[in-house]
Amino acid sequence: MPTINQLIRIGRENKRDKSTAPALKCCPQKRGVCTRVYTTTPKKPNSALRKVARVRLTNGIEVTSYIPGVGHNLQEHSVVLIRGGRVKDLPGVRYHIVRGTLDSVGVKDRKKSRSKYGAKRPK
């Protein structure tokens, strides 16, 4: 516990906020190349095959990112855009791939929440 005089002389140091998506380096999104596309299983109470990809970003960092939506066309060497946002039941997955940009096509036959999955307006 500091004394009043110590606080007057030095003052308190502000706590720094830790980034939840450090690989983006303060950018809203980053481009990268898929190095591996695979499925993985979620943590304990859940059961599924979640689609994920290892992505090497333009700044050289390699991250694991989630492929949202039903079905995808991604394979090795696909160029993708990633954004922050973790997947709660997949440990180590802190990024999402943005659907409908670069090599990633939008979700087919999507009627609701289309903007999140890069789907065009149905005719």
Swiss-Prot record:
| Skewed-composition ranges (Basic residues) | 109-123
Q: Does the keyword RNA-binding apply?
A: yes
- An example Pfam family from this entry, by short name, is Ribosom_S12_S23
Q: Which GO terms describe its biological process?
A: translation
Q: Where is this region: Disordered?
A: 104-123
Q: Which GO terms describe its molecular function?
A: rRNA binding; structural constituent of ribosome; tRNA binding
In UniProt terms, what function does this protein have?
A: With S4 and S5 plays an important role in translational accuracy. Interacts with and stabilizes bases of the 16S rRNA that are involved in tRNA selection in the A site and with the mRNA backbone. Located at the interface of the 30S and 50S subunits, it traverses the body of the 30S subunit contacting proteins on the other side and probably holding the rRNA structure together. The combined cluster of proteins S8, S12 and S17 appears to hold together the shoulder and platform of the 30S subunit.
- Name of the protein in its database record: Small ribosomal subunit protein uS12
Organism equals Pelobacter propionicus (strain DSM 2379 / NBRC 103807 / OttBd1)
High-level lineage: Bacteria, Pseudomonadati, Thermodesulfobacteriota, Desulfuromonadia, Desulfuromonadales
